[in-house]
Amino acid sequence: MGDITRFGISIDSDLLDSFDRLITRKGYQNRSEAIRDLIRATIVEEKMDAGHEEMVGTVTMVYNHHVRDLADKLTEHQHQHHHQVISALHVHLDAHNCLEVLVLKGSSAEIKQIADELLGVKGVKHGKLFLTSATPEHH
């Protein structure tokens, strides 16, 4: 971490009370830690919106592996994007359903496109994309 700069802010007391409750609920030691995390999260969102920053993400999906050709389609899709798909975890939830978590790296636009394509495959019950910055921020 670089030099620490102290600064003050003006804030409505009701908003501050809500923020303090959030800090307590999330287990922060102090307001500064919480504010730093909020700033980092906002910077990551800005990078995601830009579309060209390098990001990492996970695509988590649940599907019934008995659906005809579904597992093959998902695997083929991963191979088509082998430069972006850097890891995969496959879990058998029960006799019919599987959970798959893919780790992807690339621009936010690329990752979003791959996730949309995977989650749009017929037979995928549900899924979610989580993106974050691949560039470490100072803590």
Curated annotation (Swiss-Prot):
The protein's matches in InterPro entries, at most eight in alphabetical order, are given as: Acetolactate_synth/TF_NikR_C, ACT-like_dom_sf, Arc_rbn_hlx_hlx, CopG, CopG/NikR_regulator, Ni_resp_reg_NikR, Ribbon_hlx_hlx, TF_NikR_Ni-bd_C
User: Which biological process terms from the Gene Ontology are attached to this UniProt entry?
Assistant: response to nickel cation
Instruction: Give the family from UniProt.
Output: Belongs to the transcriptional regulatory CopG/NikR family.
Free-text function comment from the UniProt entry: Transcriptional regulator.
- What molecular function does GO assign, one term? nickel cation binding
The protein in question is named Putative nickel-responsive regulator
Enumerate the residues binding Ni(2+): 79, 90, 92, 98
Q: Which domain of life is it from?
A: Bacteria
Q: Which key words are in the record?
A: DNA-binding, Metal-binding, Nickel, Transcription, Transcription regulation
Cofactor binding mode and count: Binds 1 nickel ion per subunit.
Q: Which cofactor does it need?
A: Ni(2+)
